[in-house]
Curated annotation (Swiss-Prot):
It comes from the Viruses. This is Uncharacterized 6 kDa protein.
Amino acid sequence: MYSRGSFFKSRVTLPTLVGAYMWEFELPYLTDKRHISYSAPSVATFSLVSR
């Protein structure tokens, strides 16, 4: 049985780990010169929304 705290912790930790795992692949893609023009607007939008 999960307590409310551990359940909340698992809900927060898992997306964080998945996000970190995804950035391992996203960063080389985003920094690729061929994709800068496409990724820059979406990154700017994401950074504004997530703030």
